[in-house]
Amino acid sequence: MSEIAKEMNKFLREKDPVIFSLLSDFGREIYMPKGIISQSAEAKLHAYECNATIGIAKEDGGPMYLPSIKKFFNNLTPSEIFPYATPYGLPELRKLWREKIISENELKNKEISLPVVTHAMTNGLMLTGDLFIDKGDEIYLPNMMWGNYNLIYRIRYKANIVNYDFFNSSLTKFNVAALKEALNNCNKEKVVLLFNFPNNPTGYTPTQKEANAITEILLDLAESG
C-alpha cells in the first residue's frame, strides 16, 4: 500500500473510525498523487505562456480559444469555459453546497468535508462502488429498480443484490414491512442499502410518514449492532 494511502487511512481512522470501517479494500488503497495537485497549483501561478501540466496554450493572459465557440456562451469568461474542470467541482460551489447541507440537516457545529461533484448519477454510483463495495457484499434494492444497478454492482463489483417488494399488496404505498423483513434476515455485519428517489422506473417517492418509518428501522438496526 502506498505511503500516501497509509497516511490518509490513519487520518480517517482517527477522525471517523466508523466511516473508515465502511471503506472497501480498493477505497483504502486509492489516493490522489500529491504531485498532480501541487504541480497544477504552481502552474496556475507561474505558467504565463504554456501550462505543460495539462497541455493548455495561453493567449493574452488566458486560455487560447476559438471565438466561434466562445460566442455560444453568455457571461462566462474564457478561463471559466475552456480549461479542464477541477476533479471535484468548483471550490466556490462546493463551499456553498456544504453550507446548504449543514443548514438543512441540523449539522451546525459538525465537521464535514466538502461535497464532491460527479459526472451525473451513474458516475456517482460507480464512485460509491469503488469506495464502499467489496466482492460478495450484499446490496439491498427494491424489486422495481433501475436495470443498470445489475450491471454496476452485480457484474462490475461482484456484489450480491437482495431485492425486497417495493410496493405493498395494494400497490399504493412503500412497503416498509418488506424492507424491515429483508434487513432483519441479513446475517452479515455489513449492510448496503441504496435508495434513489423518485424511484426508477415507478417514479414513486416515500411520504414523510414512510420516510420516518424507514429512519426508525435503520436506527433500530444500528443500535442493535
Residue ranges of predicted features:
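Helix N-terminus capping/helix-initiation residues
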Residues: 23-24, 66, 175, 207
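Short, flexible segments with low predicted structural confidence
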Residues: 11-15, 68-69, 110-112, 124-125
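Conserved core of the PLP fold type I
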Residues: 80-225
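N-terminal small-domain helix-loop-helix segment of the aminotransferase-like
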Residues: 2, 6, 25-119
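Generic N-terminal amphipathic, Lys/Arg-enriched alpha-helix
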Residues: 5-25
